[in-house]
Amino acid sequence: MDRINILDCTLRDGGYVNDFNFGHVVLKDIVQKLSSASIDIIECGFLKSGAFDVNRSLFGSVEAVKKMIGNKNPNLLYVGMVQYGGISNEEIAICDGTSIDGIRLTFHEHEIAPAFVLGRQLIDKGYKVFMQPVGTMTYTDEALLKLITRINELKPFAFYLVDTLGTMYKNDLLRMFYLVDHNLNRNISVGFHSHNNLQLSFANAQELMQLNTPRRLIVDASIYGMGRGAGNLNTELVTQYINSNLGLKYDNLEILEIIDEYIRPLSMKYNWGYDAAYYIASVAGCHPNYASFLLNKQTLHVQDIHAILNNLEFEKRALFDKKYIGEEYIRYMNHHVEDEEAQNQIVNLINGKKVLLLAPGKSLRANTERINQLISEHDDYFVISVNFIPTDIVVDASFISNMKRFKSIQDIVEQ
């Protein structure tokens, strides 16, 4: 393999966007086009216990991956990812060269010991093993050096720097790389997996590839940057950079065909890429799924997301806890407004009148004249519009069900 290698993780990391449901024909064609583009390492998806759906890049066995790969290019590597605890060693067959060649094993800091046991078992089965500690930036130098000592004893194919939270600046990357490069066995590749929360994935990848080191480097990327949250380094950008600066190697037309036929249509249906909320999550040192959770509520302004994320307990920030963020969201919403005072105000405003509720819609527009007549004939009506302010009906108050809409309407009223 060349000194610098690109690993495309579209079918695995990109799978978080569409629940891994690319479709069987699309899965096979993407792998074949990546092969034709000469992408060095193709990640086919997750190995996960019990998974069985030919349309998804989730596989319960290496045999299932084999059926999706089809004819292999002998000059490339095909890999799958195992999240420690997601599948047992017994469910993974011996590597016979007909399916995946390698397994990327991802694990948290508290899972190091059992993950290394599984790593050894996979190496003994003939797989090229990529050891990938989640959130490398959260490791102290001492903890990272201890981990490297164990890596040198294990002798996997590759060891990864993983920017899980998308917080790495150039200086962070270089400091960690030099620490690893100086202490890691020379025969072990160093990989870099980034997330684009701060729009630095491409810049950091260029810095890494420009380093004067004989060590083999692996840079992860996904087509069109497809990946959960802010997404990843774009495969088409980094391959073009290598072609232009380090020597022609990749056929980018094949990658552009994948974008045109499959990925761009998905981008019309699903959202990924840079967003202020993911920037806030990165700066606050929070898992991007926290930002995704709050964005999906569609009730919060960026200022509210900033407040919630920055009030999370520090020990809870790095690992996503859906129950915890749900509780924090409810707590914030409950305390952001003094409900009792608001209730008293609305009771005083209504003051015993009949309440007429107006909701936006076709029937309201069709009956505007009748509604105005009704209001003019009954001075004992208190008129409340729900989630909008009508331009042709005078209302006494408006009820807004979420903060984001409230602030946008508030801006209109103030103007």
Where are these regions (language model features)?
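Aromatic- and Gly/Pro-rich donor/ligand-binding loops
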Residues: 48, 335-370, 389, 403
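Structural motif
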Residues: 81-84, 108, 358-362, 400-403, ...
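Acidic/Gly/His-enriched mid-domain segments of enzyme catalytic cores or analogous surface patches
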Residues: 374-382, 388-415
